[in-house]
Amino acid sequence: LSVTAPGTWNHSMVIGMMVEAAADTIDANPVLARVGAYFHDLGKLKKPLYFVENQAGAENRHDKLSPSMSSLIIRSHVKDGIELARKHRIPQVIVDMIPQHHGNSTIEYFYEKARKEAEEADGHAEVDKSLYTYPGPKPQSREAALLMLADGIEAAVRTISEPSPDRIQGLVQKMINKVFASGELDECELTLKDLHSIAKCFTRVLTGIYHQRIAYAEPAEKIFEKAGGKAAGNAPKEETSSADDPGASASKSAKTVSEDRQKEAGAKGGKEDLKRLGL
Ligand SMILES: [Fe+2]
Ligand SMILES: [Fe+2]
């Protein structure tokens, strides 16, 4: 994944941290949750460039496709993931989490696009919703439910241009409410108390990762050189740690990372991405 679908890999690592921490707070299985996160989008390996997190500013391949074809490709990552996981003899308990992380949810972005196109063509917005709906089942375990929640929330938080703790918290709560109201959590045993703990935990983890750092007055490389360091690549750990910032290359300064993120968010179009996520 890290080579073929780096955006998906990064997304999987981040939600791995989120679900592990949350599982710990609600007495679910943290290791199962984390490993489930690592494999949940394995199927994206087949067509990585059709998934927004791997496009990195390149053209959006869906621009040339009908909404139903886009939906078919997006939905197929579940089936492809199950096949790949079985081929590589991943334990069944992890394979089960692959279809459950989307449950019976609808790919709202392409469903709405199809409705709009149908209305423009013949005045009727009638579209077969089943073409835009994942096959399920809904999450059957608390770990799979955590994965479903973290999946949507992490993707949504990436679209915030200036992710302050308040904004992250607001989005986490909004997403959890949305998934709860959709009925996707009806077949698992999460309680309302669990959902409250999960929201707090996800907010803490995501704030630690995505909250903007204060920009340095001058590039970190220069500060380091003044302090007697040599190459920028040897800059101090606080400024370059990829563990602190899984979305960035380890050789980037904190300021560059921060700027990159803002550019990235701008390029992708935060509003468009939120629409894609059904918000
Ligand atoms: Fe997925
Ligand atoms: Fe995902």
List the model feature ranges, each with a label:
Residues 59-63, 115-127, 223-243, 247:
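Intrinsically disordered, low-complexity linkers and terminal tails enriched in Pro/Gly
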Residues 2-165, 169-172, 178-182, 191-192:
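Divalent metal-dependent catalytic cores for phosphoryl transfer on phosphate-bearing substrates
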Residues 238-279:
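Long, low-complexity, intrinsically disordered segments
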Residues 180, 184-239, 247, 271:
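Long, hydrophobic alpha-helical segments that serve as membrane-spanning/inserting helices
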